[in-house]
Regions:
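Hydrophobic alpha-helical segments of small multi-pass membrane proteins
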Residues: 51, 109-114
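Alpha-helical transmembrane segments and their membrane-interface boundaries
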Residues: 1-106, 132, 136-210
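Membrane-helix boundary/interface segments in integral membrane proteins
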Residues: 117-129
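Residue-level hotspots within the lipid-embedded alpha helices of multi-pass solute transporters
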Residues: 82-83, 112-113, 117
């Protein structure tokens, strides 16, 4: 995303690191874990920064991707992103459990979801883009479903099988939503209505500024 927006190397690194650890930072703030894990152990930030540099360098040498290379790149990014979503979701739940909130199911699910999608939301905000989880294919819902699957299975089996079940649910739901174009319903507002709404917002802003 940062490269497509023509960010320089520093910008690409910041966006890459934000995407990787932003959700975990938000989670730790919510559950009161200080200092946040990303700063206690900077391995994740270092790895994200290194990967960002390598991707930047590869594209700088290769130039624009086209045809099969672009398709392969997009597929690889989708698979890595989906795997990361599942792993971060489980990581978020277990981090919340270790903080002493195991009896708060909602907070556990929230911690899993915010860890999984929070970094992506911050990334989209930084690049002046609508957060993908609000307009794109099912993403946060896949994370929430995977989190619920983990908690359900964890009550009946050991930790690792619960993790695998959660990963499988998140991974499958996310990929199927992309393959079949599943989306949550949206309200389709006609162009004339959009113009009226935009004009009303502009008038309201002008009145406030007067």
């Amino acid at each position: 995303t940062a490269i497509k927006r023509r960010f320089d190397l520093f910008g690409v690194i910041i966006i890459g690191v934000t995407t990787a650890v932003g959700g975990g930072i938000m989670r730790d703030i919510v559950i009161g874990s200080h200092p946040v894990a990303a700063f206690r152990d900077p391995l994740a930030m270092s790895a994200a920064a290194l990967i960002s540099v390598l991707v930047f360098a590869a594209l700088a040498v290769k130039g624009d991707l086209g045809g099969k290379a672009l398709k392969l790149y997009d597929t690889a990014m989708l698979m890595l992103d989906t795997i990361g979503l599942g792993i971060f979701t489980v990581t978020g739940i277990t981090a919340a459990m270790r903080s002493g909130v195991s009896d708060n199911t909602f907070l556990l699910v929230f911690s899993g979801v915010i860890t999984g999608v929070g970094g992506g939301v911050l990334r989209d905000i930084f690049v002046n883009k609508k957060p993908e989880i609000f307009v794109g294919n099912i993403y946060a819902c896949a994370s929430a479903t995977g989190a619920a699957a983990f908690l359900l299975c964890y009550g009946m089996m050991s930790f690792m099988p619960a993790c695998m079940a959660s990963l499988a649910v998140t991974f499958s739901l996310r990929l199927m939503s992309v393959k079949f174009g599943w989306n949550l319903p949206k309200i389709q507002i006609k162009a004339r209505q959009e113009r009226r709404i935009a004009a009303a917002k502009e008038n309201l802003i002008n009145k406030k500024g007067a």
